[in-house]
């Protein structure tokens, strides 16, 4: 591991800043900016590669930070001027470590691999055209919490590696397999070809059945739609059933991330009630 001091806002510092805010640069360089205890721990636990880590020069590192650096083995460790380090953080009190992690593409293969390894019926979590990185992060977090096999986004979507997504996911973006597909048609074709033949459940305020009226104990693909427009016509036509969540307040629907969490919980509840673990 190479160690360098950084006291000027030159090219290397600007790289941290740019990767934090610019999706195109993240995609081109295959690098993502991250900070936060849980995010760092999850990335290390799941064997992601660190291109760089940065700590504040002159600040005594905690045992946790020293342990994380030793486990991560970043290609380079920057000892950064304290004010510069603080400026990279969106937190009131900056995390000891900010980092650049190498992006990786899981593809459908890793989702298929996880499905074949699990004793539970697969749960494929689909988010159609998510616009908000925060909602995408919440979706990842909830899918992981309630036994999701993998996450698939379709169409033009928010960036998995946006710092807001990473933060909202509490690092589960590094734990659960995920992939992007350009169209609903491609995702539906893949789901229909799966040997376990999952029930494809879409969500809609105008669904034909309440969520809890559907048997969700077998293989399931759950599709959540865009925050404003809901599921695309292709998804609505391709689903086996459209489910609705009964709500009784003034709002006609839930936030996409909240709706997904309710759905994932109901799937988990039914499976636990049937003794599936």
For each predicted feature, which ranges?
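Boundary-proximal intrinsically disordered activation/regulatory segments immediately upstream
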Residues: 1-64, 157-159
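Short acidic-hydrophobic, aromatic-tinged amphipathic segments that line or gate anion-handling sites
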Residues: 4-7, 76-81, 177-186
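Amphipathic alpha-helical repeat scaffolds
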Residues: 36, 131-138, 254-258
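RNA substrate-binding interface of SAM-dependent RNA methyltransferases
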Residues: 45, 100, 105-207
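A glycine-rich helix N-cap at a beta->alpha junction
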Residues: 68-90, 179
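Structured adenosyl-cofactor binding patch, chiefly the S-adenosyl-L-methionine
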Residues: 99, 142-146, 160, 164-173, ...
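Active-site/ligand-binding-proximal alpha/beta "capping" segment
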Residues: 201-251
């Amino acid at each position: 591991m190479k160690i360098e001091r950084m006291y000027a806002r030159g090219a290397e510092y600007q790289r941290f800043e740019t990767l934090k805010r610019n999706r195109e640069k993240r995609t081109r360089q295959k690098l993502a900016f991250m900070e936060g205890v849980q995010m760092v721990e999850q990335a290390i636990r799941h064997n992601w590669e660190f291109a760089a880590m940065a700590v504040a020069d002159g600040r005594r590192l905690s045992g946790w930070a020293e342990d994380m650096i030793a486990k991560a083995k970043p290609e380079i460790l920057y000892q950064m001027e304290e004010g510069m380090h603080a400026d990279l953080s969106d937190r009131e009190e900056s995390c000891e470590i900010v980092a650049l992690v190498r992006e990786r593409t899981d593809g459908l293969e890793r989702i298929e691999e996880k499905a074949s390894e699990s004793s539970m019926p697969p749960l494929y979590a689909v988010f159609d055209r998510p616009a908000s990185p925060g909602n995408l992060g919440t979706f990842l977090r909830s899918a992981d919490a309630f036994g999701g096999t993998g996450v698939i986004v379709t169409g033009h979507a928010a960036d998995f590696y946006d710092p807001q997504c990473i933060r909202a996911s509490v690092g589960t973006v590094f734990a659960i397999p995920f992939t992007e597909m350009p169209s609903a048609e491609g995702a539906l074709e893949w789901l229909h070809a799966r040997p376990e033949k999952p029930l494809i459940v879409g969500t809609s305020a105008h669904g034909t059945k309440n969520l809890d009226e559907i048997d969700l104990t077998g293989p399931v693909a759950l599709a959540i739609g865009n925050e404003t427009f809901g599921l695309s016509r292709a998804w609505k036509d391709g689903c086996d059933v459209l489910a609705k969540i009964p709500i009784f307040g003034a709002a006609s629907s839930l936030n996409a991330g909240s709706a997904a969490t309710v759905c994932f919980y109901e799937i988990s509840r039914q499976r636990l009630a049937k003794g599936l673990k």
